[in-house]
Amino acid sequence: MAAAVAMRGSSSDGGGYDKVSGMDSGKYVRYTPEQVEALERVYADCPKPTSSRRQQLLRECPILANIEPKQIKVWFQNRRCRDKQRKESSRLQAVNRKLTAMNKLLMEENERLQKQVSQLVHENAHMRQQLQNTPLANDTSCESNVTTPQNPLRDASNPSGLLSIAEETLTEFLSKATGTAIDWVQMPGMKPGPDSVGIVAISHGCRGVAARACGLVNLEPTKVVEILKDRPSWFRDCRNLEVFTMIPAGNGGTVELVYTQLYAPTTLVPARDFWTLRYTTTMEDGSLVVCERSLSGSGGGPSAASAQQYVRAEMLPSGYLVRPCEGGGSIVHIVDHLDLEAWSVPEVLRPLYESSRVVAQKMTTAALRHIRQIAQETSGEVVYALGRQPAVLRTFSQRLSRGFNDAISGFNDDGWSIMGGDGVEDVVIACNSTKKIRSNSNAGIAFGAPGGIICAKASMLLQSVPPAVLVRFLREHRSEWADYNIDAYLASTLKTSACSLTGLRPMRFSGSQIIIPLAHTVENEEILEVVRLEGQPLTHDEALLSRDIHLLQLCTGIDEKSVGSSFQLVFAPIDDFPDETPLISSGFRVIPLDMKTDGASSGRTLDLASSLEVGSATAQASGDASADDCNLRSVLTIAFQFPYELHLQDSVAAMARQYVRSIVSAVQRVSMAISPSQTGLNAGQRIISGFPEAATLARWVCQSYHYHLGVELLSQSDGDAEQLLKMLWHYQDAILCCSFKEKPVFTFANKAGLDMLETSLVALQDLTLDRIFDEPGKEALFSNIPKLMEQGHVYLPSGVCMSGMGRHVSFDQAVAWKVLAEDSNVHCLAFCFVNWSFV
């Protein structure tokens, strides 16, 4: 109340007058400038001083001797309120500016759509009139609809000719960015709003594939243009961008001849390149424009020898329109319009080159997200772990991704060459003798003997396997496919100057992996993390040696709401974190071939119960498993890199080939386990072998809870078994069931339980009860076991447990009870963790 009174009576200049509560309504305290300065110094160090601190202030500052302690208290209250008001006012002004800009953007989009509707109505009326008046003149009625061919390539050595092409490119680009040159439709799954990446649209019925995005970013136009022109920094598929010629143009603009190389997304298709003209200029209203188009469909650019591994693609007028925004920031329009020569790839992979949605996700929205990411980092909104600078972590992500792309594409000019196989063409082995791994201690030393890198890679088609589900499983359950000794071999190459196979000691993976988050993008489409794999020595002598392995890992598309065009898990062993750490990238990439309109498959979770809506009604589950999920096709690419010494080249190649084959087999097993068509048919039996069906278990859990505790677990416990199962599955607290054995293993969990453990029903059996509790939790549990056996239930105090990924989870209370079967024998133990959350 005193603060409120003080606020009403305070001056707005920060400290002239203060009205003291409890005093006369007309009595104010006037502070001298010296007194205000002294109080401001204290406020800067401690905005909310205690009573003793205020008393100390009066003693130490004679200038404040004539002010009562109560008046000092009110001054600090008043000062805090003014500070809070200023911050809130600043925040609201920023929000208002953003909403004003978004409103302007939406009004412009609405105006463009109205023009498009008018144009379509006019064309429709014209077409109807033609059909009515000239029914027999079909051969001539279409002449007006023939698309005007692209202008032929003019003399590239003639600057005036290039400037003319640049102006034409600018006009065509603007007609796409803000006009109706292309019939744009909103991309499915993208909902515009203040928190969205922007307004995203894809082409309908035009030549090639095209995408358009517009959004608001908190960066100045010149900075936005600088970032967007540096395409390799944000477009992960861009291998190289080289400017061959630069010609000055009017308004301080430039015309450039640019050669761009793209990576191949998989080993099954060739890479693409572009030979383009890029025009940068300033508009009359102060907007900046960067527009670009191919100079020709083929020919031009570097020599044929350097481009022999590429298919020349065509860029139709595309680019960026960046307009300054009142109050700071920019409104950005991005258009990508390409002809990717889909004829040159196998038919099954052509959707990758014929889908405008793929272009929107890989290029257009990627550019907008990258700008937003940098804007948030610049403003200090993003704070990363371990004190790392955002730019440094972003560099690590780029290096991981680039190394993986290099391995998949295997360009000759990078030193890659194909090695002979063993007669079976399932795994491709490539060798690069020019690529060296340098030690940290001496950057001039690579290996003790000449060597290089061997890459084993394979691609396979997957049917009915949701990509995000597969990548999440590979990330969370490395022991299902990885060989710890191979990881140890790769890690050892960073610590020693020799890559020896015989020097490795056999080790066993303990099954424990700790994931430490480092950074993530704005919408969590990319996550950078460190993974620690705990090794288990086979002999007592080795127990004293540290055998843990650390991996730097980049995950793409594993978020529940991901609707991306590529899902990746890329990693490399690391020994330290200096900027020059060598990264030998390996991993997996899954690319959907059937781009669905609703993006539902990637939001599916790993648990089998979700495909049932949970329960034993397998017939319903089989029917409910989306037909899109069951027919979903994708291509999986696997690439693993191995350093070698020259005299061990053949041995490392054989090891690499066999290792990748074993990974392919493991992925095939996992794919069958998580396929919706399989889970729908067998989910009732798959909850665990020899276990009762889920509906029966749910009934036993609820009945036993009521029997032991005297209260109902669920609000409606008198429904049928399947209804109970659905309610138990969606219950707010985590419910876990474990076997009633000497070493209890988890056998079932509801959705909250799986979220808490960060696992799935497929991998739940890998977790034991003792693994999730810390030491105090284990002591509390073990000390209460006699009580649990005697009375059938026990309450555990609040504490901390561990998820399957090694994260700490706090809970307010836990309840454990015995689950009785029909014959009244103990079938399993059940736990309920109340109000759990990640620490």
From Swiss-Prot:
Stimuli inducing this protein: Repressed by miR166 in the shoot apicam meristem (SAM) region of developing embryo.
Tissue: Expressed in stems, leaf sheaths and blades and panicles.
Renumbered residue ranges of the record's region Disordered: 1-24, 132-157
Regions annotated as coiled coil: 91-134
Residues within the DNA-binding region(s): 24-87
Record carries keyword rRNA-binding: no
Location within or outside the cell: Nucleus
SMART domains documented for this protein: HOX (SM00389), START (SM00234)
UniProt record similarity statement: Belongs to the HD-ZIP homeobox family. Class III subfamily.
Protein known as: Homeobox-leucine zipper protein HOX10
